[in-house]
């Protein structure tokens, strides 16, 4: 242990991950010799390990599995590899490329008797004596070593049968000599039972939380395997571990894997199950669980959903819960000093657990199993797809990069959804009535990248199921004009997500918020949607008035929850539409219930400041009344970029008209540029309305002409064969002319003047067009904005004072 720990003072968790340099650790390779009892090494390796041909060796694999084999030398095998066939690999629960350890095992006795049973699906339809046809030729004169629990495959009589070693005497391993008695009576073993033990979770099946897993290994495996270590140092090993994190990150899975890999007795307590209506029974259920575990030490007790049985005592009204919490506390304290029982618990609400449980000596280690990052997601996807048939075009890295905020459970769902989609495509080739499916169809099944794309469009991160997070279907093409605004937005949201290294290089944290303001109908909401879509971030849209509720304190809690969710699903864009409804200037709201609106603003302010820099959460606010918004929200560091989205100019109007009509058939002679020239002062929404009205008129005409044609057919059936062309193939000029008769401006000149005044005031209070550092060439022109006078520095301080107290 020391060799790993003292290298540059690494902490234990990484030390355990590093494999020590041991010569008896070898990499598993495919066997050339197909014998079930033979493994082969290179001659130099055998010399190093002091082994001879024909020696019996003990191999240790994953999940505490062992096997006993005969070792032979093989010149084609490289020094660090060991060749073994599939049967041995399955018994050791390892795959090609895994690492196993090998050690000499000289004292294997000859067996007196062994008991083997066949596995049911391999012996179906076999008549005759299993022993004579299979077992006798397999063991005769071979002196094979076997171990209890091994499964071996015997070929003979046209087919292969699998047997499992149920019992050996002496146990747990022996050599089958000519005078060993072989029993094979009894019911065949069911394949399902075997599969279950094969599919037990191990550490390999957990992805995306390496660091946490290393921490847990250190806390669980060390005390269970080497209690002497702690004795030598003179401390007690940790007793309890609390795993917490959002649902679906793999807390229960980790506990199962730990139990399987350590070989400890695993006792699962599901929180709600131990509750009972009879007084005293729930507590005795708990006591029984702990007694059972102590009898079978070393043991792991795993309490799932701890918050169900140990809520805060002052908050619960039921007497039963209080008694259970007290019982759990006394049991955790009363675990005998050296009884190797470790209590693990999982919850996704650590703050609702009684604080007495979270002190040292009870659940003294808390491990946060968070949402995995892109590398973690890739690990998880590789684990879930290792048994899937993937087409060559599947790029799991790409999928991992696009699934922001997904936890392990979501990724598992994603993989199965993609596989189902692959099957759906082949559904027309599959006849459900048939007993079997063609081998051709089976072989052609493969999951392609398109299936993953489809599954991605269907799946949401589970943390955000209730606040519907849609990645909107709006792209930059849908937005006409506003080029500068688009560029600024891309810099704000896409750079921190796509180029975090640049921010590190220049030592800056990216800015977090933007406020759009401008007249209604200019595309503020549309911009927010497009940015969320372009950078593949999650998008939570919050309508201002929805946050306010009638209950005291609940509105603030809503704000808190939304920010928590956004942090969980980072990178995430939080879009506050109609910000003025919830962020009015404080103090002026007379008649609002108990100052609820003020408290909501305070909560939003603190959340914006407290957003940890690690997470990419961006806030976009939109309003058309910027003058009534609380100035504290508009300071740099919160919504630091104020972007005025003006009415579109002529060029933008053409772009908007084109964007609106890009899917519609429009006649060649419709001059959109002229239309744009005539619609001065129209907002984007007004222009969209003109296009819609023109479409509507074209549709109306088309339907009317169809009805007319139908009537003509009925009156004159003989003329039916004549194929007429479409009377209204496209939207014509007269449709637009008619639509323009009803067009109106939704924003008056007066309103625009107000917005422009506001924009100008902001510019004046913030900009210094003439600021230059003093150097050889001083100056520049006079101040373009700002009231000027004196040096740039003076203006700056005065202006700042002005801004602060103004």
UniProtKB/Swiss-Prot annotation:
Residue numbers carrying N6-succinyllysine: 668
Residues with PTM Phosphothreonine: 436
Region span, Interaction with UBXN6: 797-806
GO CC term (a single one): VCP-NSFL1C complex
One Pfam family per UniProt: AAA_lid_3
Catalytic activity: ATP + H2O = ADP + phosphate + H(+)
Keyword annotations: Acetylation, ATP-binding, Autophagy, Cytoplasm, DNA damage, DNA repair, Endoplasmic reticulum, Hydrolase, Isopeptide bond, Lipid-binding, Methylation, Nucleotide-binding, Nucleus, Phosphoprotein, Transport, Ubl conjugation
GO molecular function: ADP binding; ATP binding; ATP hydrolysis activity; BAT3 complex binding; deubiquitinase activator activity; identical protein binding; K48-linked polyubiquitin modification-dependent protein binding; lipid binding
SMART domains in UniProt: AAA (SM00382), CDC48_2 (SM01072), CDC48_N (SM01073)
N-acetylalanine PTM sites in chain numbering: 2
CDD domains from the UniProt entry: RecA-like_CDC48_r1-like, RecA-like_CDC48_r2-like
EC number annotated for this UniProt entry: 3.6.4.6
Entries under InterPro entries matching the protein: AAA+_ATPase, AAA_ATPase_CDC48, AAA_ATPase_domain, AAA_lid_3, Asp_de-COase-like_dom_sf, ATPase_AAA_core, ATPase_AAA_CS, Cdc48_dom2
Modification Phosphotyrosine occurs at: 805
Residues bearing the modification N6-acetyllysine: 502, 505, 668, 754
Position of sequence motif PIM motif: 802-806
Annotated GO biological process: aggresome assembly; ATP metabolic process; autophagosome maturation; autophagy; cellular response to arsenite ion; cellular response to heat; cellular response to misfolded protein; cytoplasm protein quality control
Compartments where found: Cytoplasm, Cytosol; Endoplasmic reticulum; Nucleus; Cytoplasm, Stress granule
Domains (record comment): The PIM (PUB-interaction motif) motif mediates interaction with the PUB domain of RNF31.
Oligomeric form and interacting partners: Homohexamer. Forms a ring-shaped particle of 12.5 nm diameter, that displays 6-fold radial symmetry. Interacts with NSFL1C-like protein p37; the complex has membrane fusion activity and is required for Golgi and endoplasmic reticulum biogenesis. Interacts with RHBDD1 (via C-terminal domain). Interacts with SELENOS and SYVN1, as well as with DERL1 (via SHP-box motif), DERL2 and DERL3; which probably transfer misfolded proteins from the ER to VCP. Interacts with SVIP and DERL1.
Name under which the protein is recorded: Transitional endoplasmic reticulum ATPase
Organism: Rattus norvegicus
The encoding gene: Vcp
């Amino acid at each position: 242990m020391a060799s790993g720990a003292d290298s540059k003072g690494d902490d234990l968790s990484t030390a355990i991950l590093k494999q020590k340099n041991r010569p008896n650790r070898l990499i598993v390779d495919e066997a050339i010799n197909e014998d079930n009892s033979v493994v082969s090494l290179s001659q130099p390796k055998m010399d190093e390990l002091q082994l001879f041909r024909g020696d019996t060796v003990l191999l240790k694999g994953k999940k505490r599995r062992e096997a006993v084999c005969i070792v032979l030398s093989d010149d084609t095998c490289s020094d660090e590899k060991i060749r073994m066939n599939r049967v041995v690999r399955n018994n050791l629960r390892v795959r090609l490329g895994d690492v196993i350890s090998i050690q000499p095992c000289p004292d294997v006795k000859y067996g007196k008797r062994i008991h083997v049973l066949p596995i049911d699906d391999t012996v179906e339809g076999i008549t005759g004596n299993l022993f004579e046809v299979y077992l006798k030729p397999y063991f005769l004169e071979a002196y094979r070593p076997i171990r209890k629990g091994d499964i071996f495959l015997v070929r003979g009589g046209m087919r292969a049968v699998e047997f499992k070693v149920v019992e050996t005497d002496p146990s747990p391993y022996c050599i089958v000599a000519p005078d060993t008695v072989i029993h094979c009576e009894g019911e065949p073993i069911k394949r399902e039972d075997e599969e279950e033990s094969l599919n037990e979770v191990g550490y390999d099946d957990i992805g995306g939380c390496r660091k946490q897993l290393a921490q847990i290994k250190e806390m669980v495996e060390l005390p269970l395997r080497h209690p002497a270590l702690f004795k030598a140092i003179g401390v007690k090993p940790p007793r309890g571990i609390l795993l917490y994190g959002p649902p679906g990150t793999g807390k229960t899975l980790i506990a199962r894997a730990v139990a399987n890999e350590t070989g400890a007795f695993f006792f699962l307590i599901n929180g709600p199950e131990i509750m009972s209506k009879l007084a005293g029974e729930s507590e005795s259920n708990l006591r029984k669980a702990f007694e059972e575990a102590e009898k079978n030490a070393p043991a792991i007790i795993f309490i799932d959903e701890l918050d169900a049985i140990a809520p805060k005592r002052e908050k619960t009204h039921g007497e039963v819960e209080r008694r259970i919490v007290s019982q759990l506390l006394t049991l955790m304290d009363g675990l005998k000093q050296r009884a190797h029982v470790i209590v693990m618990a999982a919850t996704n609400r650590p703050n609702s657990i009684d604080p007495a449980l979270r002190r040292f000596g009870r659940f003294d280690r808390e491990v946060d199993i968070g949402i995995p990052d892109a590398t973690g997601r890739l690990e998880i996807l590789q684990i879930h797809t290792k048994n899937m048939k993937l087409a060559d075009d599947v790029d799991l890295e790409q999928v991992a990069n696009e699934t922001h905020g997904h936890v392990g459970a979501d990724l598992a769902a994603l993989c199965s959804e993609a596989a189902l989609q692959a099957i759906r495509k082949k559904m027309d080739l599959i006849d459900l009535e048939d007993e079997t499916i063609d081998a051709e169809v089976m072989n052609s099944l493969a999951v392609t990248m398109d299936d993953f794309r489809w599954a991605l469009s269907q799946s949401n991160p589970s943390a955000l199921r209730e606040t519907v997070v849609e990645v909107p279907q709006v792209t930059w093409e849908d937005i006409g004009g506003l080029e500068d605004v688009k560029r600024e937005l891309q810099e704000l949201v896409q750079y921190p997500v796509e180029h975090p290294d640049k921010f590190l290089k220049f030592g800056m944290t990216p800015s977090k918020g933007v406020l759009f303001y401008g007249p209604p109908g200019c595309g503020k909401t549309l911009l927010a949607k497009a940015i969320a879509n372009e950078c593949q971030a999650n998008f939570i849209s919050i309508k201002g008035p929805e946050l306010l509720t009638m209950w005291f304190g609940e509105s603030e809690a809503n704000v808190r929850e939304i920010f928590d969710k956004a942090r969980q699903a980072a990178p995430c864009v939080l879009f506050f539409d109609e910000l003025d409804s919830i962020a009015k200037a404080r103090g002026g709201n007379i008649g609002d219930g108990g100052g609820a609106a003020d408290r909501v603003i305070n909560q939003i302010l603190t959340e914006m400041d407290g957003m940890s820099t690690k997470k990419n959460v961006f806030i976009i606010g939109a309003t058309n009344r910027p003058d009534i918004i609380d100035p504290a929200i508009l300071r740099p560091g919160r919504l630091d970029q104020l972007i005025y989205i003006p009415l579109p100019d002529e060029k933008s109007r053409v772009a908007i008209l084109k964007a609106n009509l890009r899917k519609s058939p429009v006649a060649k002679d419709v001059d959109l540029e002229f239309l744009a020239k005539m619609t001065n002062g129209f907002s984007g929404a007004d222009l969209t309305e003109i296009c819609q009205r023109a479409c509507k008129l074209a549709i109306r005409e088309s339907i009317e002409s169809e009805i007319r044609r139908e009537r003509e057919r009925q009156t004159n059936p003989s003329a039916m064969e004549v194929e007429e062309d479409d009377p209204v193939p496209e939207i014509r000029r007269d449709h637009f002319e008619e639509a323009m008769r009803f067009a109106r401006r939704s924003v008056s000149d007066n309103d625009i003047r107000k917005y422009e005044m506001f924009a100008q005031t902001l510019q004046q209070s913030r900009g210094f067009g003439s600021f230059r550092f003093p150097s050889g060439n001083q100056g520049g022109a006079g101040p373009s904005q700002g009231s000027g006078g004196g040096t740039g520095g003076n203006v700056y301080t005065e202006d700042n004072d002005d801004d602060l107290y103004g």
